[in-house]
Amino acid sequence: MSTDIDFLYRPGFHFTPAKNWMNDPNGLVFHKGEYHLFYQHNPFGTKWGHMSWGHAVSTDLLNWKHLDIAISEDADGAIFSGSAVSIGDEIVAIYTRHTETNQTQCIATSKDNGRTFTKFESNPVLDLDMADFRDPKVFRYEDQWIMAVVKPHEHVCVFYKSIDLIKWEFLSEFGPAAAIGGVWECPDLFPLTYNGEELWVLLISLNPGAINNGTGTQYFVGSFDGVTFRPKYPIEKPRWLDHGRDNYAGATFNDAPDGRRIFIGWMANWQDLGSHPATSWTNAMTIPRELGLTKIGEEIVLTQQPLCSPTYELIIDTTKKHRSGLTGFVELGYDPSTQKIFVDNYTADVKPVNNRIHLKVLVDQSSVELYTSDGVSWITMAVFPQAGVTRALSDFG
């Protein structure tokens, strides 16, 4: 049942579950004219537990239709994170089955556009007899399927190949590398083009130990030949997809139209879950973002552009300190002494052009996403202001 507090905090253009708990986006795939967003879901309450796959579909990535639970927890285990692929008329989900002592990779098939799934009777399809081995991302590479899956505590992403999604053959490993202060989770690997050159981007989520002292997602730019991922540059420090505290476990859509690479993340973090108000639903997704590449100095870096218009835009003179705010909400701006943009205590490096920075802000009830117009630097935060706050942007020096 909807309440006043639900109305106050439920975003208008970010995805939220109809009710109960949600975390990682799963099984992102475009199939027969619909974007499918599956997600980690507790059907029975607003706290984490009974992990199953919730489900929603959209034709534009902003307006979503809630559907029934797609894959439910059963006596064999909980349904943890994974991915989905489109094969003809079918959607095949590849997910981690979790028990207290073992995590294995399993598959389930839908013949009705993702509305219902049948679990493969010979699951699991990949079992290393490990307590922590999870989050398979599967995609097509030439004439075979590739799986990226992590050994979280070893800080390793493992690659496998398969012809039929059932029999998997080991290919290679990547890691440990860059940030290893927490467990590795939710890998994704995909191609993007820069100036006619195909490059591959590997995403690895980290919990905790990210730049914001909590959860976050690092990325690597490199090459992939169907066997091995090789970074393009020496790995001297992590590169972060987002500098805020609330963008974790994100993934990209398989088979998005026109070859677009579209990302959605979980707009929360594991260190600060107690701050969510007592609504009938818990947590939201980030705004969908189209990914690309650009060059900063001598390195090629990731860019993100939202699939909606900004709420506010700021042109900042970088010779001066600039502070703006949403009254009683958050403070944001630019500090010329550090050359960083900030939202409250979270910062991101920027490179001014002609002493100017063009910032854009998405504000949606209980979230703020600040980003540079080139899409290189982002700060994402879930925030829960008190009732009566106007959420209007104002300058205060």
Place the predicted regions along the sequence by residue.
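Beta-rich accessory regions
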Residues: 1, 195, 218-397
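Surface loop/turn signatures of beta-propeller and other carbohydrate-active proteins
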Residues: 1-26, 45-48, 62-86, 114-140, ...
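Structural WD40 beta-propeller signal
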Residues: 31, 87, 139-141, 190-192, ...
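Entry beta-strands of beta-propeller and related beta-repeat scaffolds
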Residues: 34-37, 89-94, 144-147, 196-202, ...
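Short glycine/acidic-enriched loop and turn motifs that connect beta-strands
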Residues: 42-46, 98-101, 152-155, 207-210, ...
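Beta-propeller blade signature
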Residues: 52-60, 105-113, 159-165, 215-226, ...
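Carboxylate/His-rich catalytic cores and anion/metal-binding grooves
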Residues: 81, 90-125
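Conserved, charged catalytic cores of large soluble enzymes
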Residues: 143, 149-158
